[in-house]
C-alpha cells in the first residue's frame, strides 16, 4: 500500500508539472507589411523606438530557448489609423488574417488577439464579428 501511495503521488506530480506551461501574453508580431505601412505614414519611429524585425521561425526558437510553451500575439503600437478608415481597415484585416494563418500553422503554440480598426466603431464591430466567426 505504501508503494502504491508513493507511485500515485509521483505520477500526480509528473502530471501536474507537465500540465503547466509558460504562456507569453505580451508578444507583438510585426509583419514586414505592417512596418512598410508605418513607413509610408512616417510613423515607423526609426530614430526613437524602431520596431524590431520579426519572423515566426526566430520567435519559435526564442520560445523554445526561454521555455515558453505558447504565445498570444498582438499588433504592436502605433495603431494604424492615419485619417483613412478604409486603409486602416485593410491593414487590420491583413494583420488578423496573417495572424490566423500563424495560429493554424502552429496549433498549440500560437494564439492571437484580433485587432480592430479604431476609431471607426462601425468598422471595428464588423472586424470583431469577422474575427470571431473565422
Q: What is the predicted function of each stretch?
A:
Residues 10, 18-134:
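Helix-coil boundary/capping segments in enzymes
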Amino acid at each position: 500500500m505504501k508503494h502504491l501511495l508513493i507511485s500515485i503521488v509521483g505520477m500526480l506530480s509528473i502530471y501536474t508539472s507537465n500540465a503547466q506551461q509558460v504562456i507569453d501574453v505580451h508578444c507583438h508580431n510585426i509583419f514586414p507589411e505592417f512596418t512598410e505601412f508605418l513607413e509610408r505614414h512616417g510613423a515607423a519611429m526609426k530614430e526613437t523606438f524602431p520596431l524590431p524585425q520579426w519572423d515566426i521561425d526566430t520567435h519559435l526558437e526564442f520560445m523554445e530557448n526561454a521555455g515558453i510553451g505558447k504565445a498570444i500575439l498582438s499588433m504592436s503600437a502605433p495603431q494604424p489609423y492615419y485619417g483613412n478608415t478604409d486603409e486602416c481597415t485593410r491593414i487590420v484585416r491583413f494583420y488578423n488574417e496573417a495572424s490566423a494563418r500563424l495560429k493554424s500553422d502552429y496549433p498549440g503554440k500560437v494564439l492571437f488577439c484580433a485587432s480592430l480598426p479604431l476609431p471607426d466603431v462601425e468598422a471595428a464591430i464588423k472586424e470583431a464579428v469577422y474575427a470571431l466567426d473565422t
